[in-house]
């Protein structure tokens, strides 16, 4: 399960009371949830060329890590940010350095950061495995931080970025590229999302499982692939029904479908 620990559209954040943190931990244990992760605020951009925004973003990551640690959450999923008008290589390095700074400022905590693959919409970084690998390589130079940074692969994002997920031969090649460039040992979570847009569109628009351009057949290949069998899949599919209102049945439908495809 993935949660937000704060309002994702505001910089200001209310502290978590210890009583609430304890109750949350007890609820997770009682529900027998195998994994709970957090997602960071959408305002955060550690790659920003604006020093003021970047400073706020780094502090934002620190806050996310502190809140996750208090709640017993091992990972915070974070987008690497956007380059804006900067050279992409410069922006990649700034993103990595921002993550380094946030991890150093929380060195006594155990929670870490999962860098999320992106669709590459606009100037967003992380739409190629090479860019993610470059960030990891820069962070890994500080050995004490290596265990606190890994990767979250989003199926919609990698598909929109141009990585095919079917037929099996194409999925095998995508996984091979990921392993050779980043390493499957760094893959901790998969966001399971279909895509409203076509392969290589670079448009980040999620769709329900089997209802988009990725398709049901590709998700069957994904959830049964031997190299992904130990990686948790977490939904980020749309919550709204046909009337545009939140419909909790959507999550139930998507979970049941993934489980059927896995069997």
Which residues are covered by each model-predicted region?
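Active-site beta-loop-alpha junctions enriched in small/polar residues
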Residues: 4-8, 40-43, 81-83, 116-122, ...
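Histidine-acidic metal/acid-base catalytic patches
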Residues: 133-263
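N-terminal hydrophobic or amphipathic segments with adjacent small-residue motifs
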Residues: 35, 75, 204-206
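Hydrophobic faces of well-ordered beta-strands that scaffold small-molecule active sites
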Residues: 1-3, 36-40, 76-78, 113-115, ...
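Acidic (Asp/Glu)-rich catalytic clusters
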Residues: 16-37, 64-72, 103-109, 137-148, ...
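N-terminal pre-domain/capping segments
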Residues: 1-40, 44-65, 263
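Active-site acidic/histidine proton-transfer and metal-coordination neighborhood
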Residues: 46-150
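Alpha-helix N-cap and loop-to-helix initiation/capping positions
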Residues: 12-20, 48-60, 86-98, 123-134, ...
């Amino acid at each position: 399960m993935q949660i937000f620990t704060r309002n994702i559209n505001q910089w200001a954040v209310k502290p978590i009371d210890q009583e609430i943190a304890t109750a949350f931990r007890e609820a997770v244990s009682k529900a027998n949830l195998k994994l709970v992760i957090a997602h960071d605020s959408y305002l955060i951009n550690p790659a920003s060329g604006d020093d003021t925004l970047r400073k706020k973003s780094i502090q934002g990551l620190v806050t996310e890590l502190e809140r996750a640690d208090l709640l017993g959450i091992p990972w915070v999923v974070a987008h690497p940010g956007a380059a804006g008008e900067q050279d992409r290589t410069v922006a990649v390095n700034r993103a990595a350095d921002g993550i380094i700074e946030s991890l150093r400022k929380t060195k006594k905590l155990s929670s870490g950061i999962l860098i999320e693959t992106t669709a590459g919409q606009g100037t967003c970084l992380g739409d190629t495995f090479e860019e993610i690998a470059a960030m990891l390589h820069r962070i890994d130079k500080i050995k004490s931080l290596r265990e606190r940074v890994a990767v979250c692969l989003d199926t919609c994002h990698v598909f929109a970025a141009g990585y095919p997920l079917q037929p099996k031969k194409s999925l095998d090649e995508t996984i091979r590229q990921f392993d050779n460039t980043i390493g499957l040992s760094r893959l901790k979570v998969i966001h399971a999302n279909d895509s409203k847009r076509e392969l290589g569109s670079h448009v980040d628009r999620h769709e329900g499982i089997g209802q988009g351009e990725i398709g049901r057949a590709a998700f069957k290949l994904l959830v049964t692939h031997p190299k992904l069998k130990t990686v948790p899949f977490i939904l980020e599919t749309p919550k709204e029904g046909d009337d545009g209102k939140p419909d909790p049945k959507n999550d139930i439908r998507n979970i049941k479908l993934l489980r059927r495809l896995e069997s």
